[in-house]
Amino acid sequence: GDTGVLVATRLARSCQVVGISTRPALVSGQELGNRLTDPAGWRRSYLVPYRRFRRLDRVRTVHGRITSVDLDRREVRVDRTYLGIAVEPYDVLVIATGASNGFWRHDRVEDLPAIDDQLATVAARLEAAATIAVVGGGATGVSVADNLARRGGTEVHLFHSGDVPLPGYHPKVRRWIVRRLRD
């Protein structure tokens, strides 16, 4: 994820770093609304193969899924899908497994075509929907509802607690988004 890439790039300046990921690219959790309504546009900015990060040139990447960690031996076991199990020793273990609340998060090992297929499947489901319910009045929920509504062709309902979405935001912003969502 975003944090794992940042940590790896910083540590690679002074340490030997091995990055282990179930995907060969950064699949950012940013801009969910754009991801759902404009997957091709989202992909250009938020699906970035690790090889495009110059600061990761010094990081050895392993494409696979960690199946176990032996804290006493300081080793992780990695299932590399088609290449078998690898044992990676470490001096310091940094765990940056990403946010667990996103619907796109899972621990399957994927290649870029599988990620593209998943994006296309979600886009097709949304395109075919007559009505979409978005639950959550925070920034992500509001962004998703706004992006879906602006795309058109679908009735979008935003469900949130409280009188208006974006609790804690300035009242002017809250009024603006309510007007925008109603239009």
For the regions a protein language model found, what residue spans apply to each?
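Glycine/Thr-rich phosphate-binding loops of Rossmann-like dinucleotide-binding domains
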Residues: 103-104, 143, 166
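FAD-binding core/adjacent interface of flavoenzyme oxidoreductases
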Residues: 56-133
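Short glycine-/small-residue-rich flexible loop motifs, especially phosphate/cofactor-binding loops
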Residues: 51, 91, 178
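Alpha-helical segments flanking ligand/cofactor-binding loops in enzyme cores
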Residues: 9, 124, 146, 178-179
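Beta1-alpha1 glycine-rich phosphate/pyrophosphate-binding loop at the start
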Residues: 1-60, 146-172
